[in-house]
Amino acid sequence: MSTARTAAARPLVVSADEELLDDLLRLLAAAGTEPELATGGPALRRAHRDASLVLLGSDALTGGVLRALPRRPGVVVVSGRPLPPIGWAAAVEVGAERVAVLPEDEAWLLSRSAAAAKI
């Protein structure tokens, strides 16, 4: 497998929530993958385009930076608590295929992350 292919297969994590980041990094390590972290600018646009899976922390939904990104498959919003209605609306707006609430959805997210790592 080439380096370019390996880099493209990395999941993207977008969040500034340190507790959520710790949980996601642990979970992604268990899935056998190392994510790319980005919060804005050209790095976010490139990583969003190339990532095998995009994990958006619920904290990232409130910023306008995600609105400029094109919709794509493989976007999951991740939160440490159930989302309020405005959070669900924002998840729909960014085209999320699912909202995963940790720790309840950890097994599903682990499976989804492992599957994306094989792409």
Question: What residue spans do the PLM features occupy?
Answer:
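A short, hydrophobic beta-strand element within the central beta-sheet of small alpha/beta folds
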Residues: 73-83
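Short amphipathic alpha-helix used as the core "switch/output" element in two-component signaling
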Residues: 61-72
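C-terminal output helix
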Residues: 104-113
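Alpha4 helix (beta4-alpha4-beta5 surface) of REC/receiver domains from two-component response regulators
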Residues: 82-98
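A short, well-structured beta->alpha microelement
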Residues: 2, 23-52, 56-63
